[in-house]
UniProtKB/Swiss-Prot annotation:
Gene Ontology BP term (one): thiamine diphosphate biosynthetic process
Source species: Photorhabdus laumondii subsp. laumondii (strain DSM 15139 / CIP 105565 / TT01) (Photorhabdus luminescens subsp. laumondii)
Protein's recorded name: Thiamine-phosphate synthase
Entry keyword set: Magnesium, Metal-binding, Thiamine biosynthesis, Transferase
Catalytic activity: 2-[(2R,5Z)-2-carboxy-4-methylthiazol-5(2H)-ylidene]ethyl phosphate + 4-amino-2-methyl-5-(diphosphooxymethyl)pyrimidine + 2 H(+) = thiamine phosphate + CO2 + diphosphate; 2-(2-carboxy-4-methylthiazol-5-yl)ethyl phosphate + 4-amino-2-methyl-5-(diphosphooxymethyl)pyrimidine + 2 H(+) = thiamine phosphate + CO2 + diphosphate; 4-methyl-5-(2-phosphooxyethyl)-thiazole + 4-amino-2-methyl-5-(diphosphooxymethyl)pyrimidine + H(+) = thiamine phosphate + diphosphate
Record family assignment: Belongs to the thiamine-phosphate synthase family.
InterPro entries: Aldolase_TIM (IPR013785), ThiamineP_synth_sf (IPR036206), ThiamineP_synth_TenI (IPR022998), TMP_synthase (IPR034291)
Pfam families: TMP-TENI (PF02581)
Protein encoded by which gene: thiE
Role: Condenses 4-methyl-5-(beta-hydroxyethyl)thiazole monophosphate (THZ-P) and 2-methyl-4-amino-5-hydroxymethyl pyrimidine pyrophosphate (HMP-PP) to form thiamine monophosphate (TMP).
Binding site for Mg(2+): 73, 92
Its EC number(s): 2.5.1.3
Length: 216
């Protein structure tokens, strides 16, 4: 890991609530309009020459809605365009300039998949820690096994000083069990983007996770 910071990363809300992870500016625009306030842009298949513009536009849109927009992986562009925060996987921690991210005031979220990675994340004092994957998922190839709700509950209890995010295979039906662990946020991908009616799914999820009932 390069240039380890000697201070904690900027804090974020202890309970981030519903946290959709999407791959395009179009999805960010749709979800911010429905009342989502925490969101992640995880670009996967965009040509490299289009990535910066997509990130810049997403950050501007996030500011417009006063949202907590985290950029996955592209920490240099997140710094350059003044993102709210960055999300890094374990492999990204090795190459990212964590000191630069911390000094610019960006919030940092870190993925973890077991107790060892959780301990490593805590040592960096990030803004939030993602705990996963909780259930089997087809969104991303995972070398680790699903941890399940009981392990999630234990990890949340052992991480009281951090904002925590549950991620991995969480469907609408599984949300109540996940919330019952005390986790501060629920990250979802397919439950929204592959729903028959994404607006209805988002409204249901906002109600389940944050108690927000959308009008109209």
């Amino acid at each position: 890991m390069n240039n380890l910071p000697n201070a904690p990363f900027a804090p974020t809300e202890h309970r981030l609530g519903l946290y959709p992870v999407v791959d395009s500016l179009a999805w960010i625009s749709r979800l911010l309009q429905t009342g989502v306030t925490t969101i992640q842009l995880r670009i996967k298949d965009l040509p490299e020459d289009q990535v910066e513009e997509e990130i810049q536009q997403a950050i501007m849109l996030g500011r417009q809605y006063n949202a907590r927009l985290f950029i996955n992986d592209y920490w240099r562009l997140a710094i350059k365009h003044g993102a709210y925060g960055v999300h890094l996987g374990q492999e990204d921690l090795v190459i990212a300039d964590l000191n630069a991210i911390q000094k610019t005031g960006l919030r940092l979220g870190i993925s973890t998949h077991d107790e060892q990675e959780l301990a490593r994340a805590k040592s960096l004092r990030p803004s939030y820690i993602a705990l996963g994957h909780i259930f089997p998922t087809t969104t991303k190839a995972m070398p680790s096994s699903p941890q399940g709700v009981e392990a999630l509950k234990r990890q949340v209890e052992n991480t009281p000083d951090y904002s925590t995010v549950a991620i991995g295979g969480i469907s609408l039906e599984r949300v109540p069990d996940v919330i019952a662990t005390g986790v501060g946020s629920v990250a979802l991908v397919s439950a929204i983007t592959k729903a028959k009616d994404w607006r209805q799914a988002t409204a249901q999820l906002l109600y389940l996770v944050e108690g927000i009932e959308l009008k109209g």
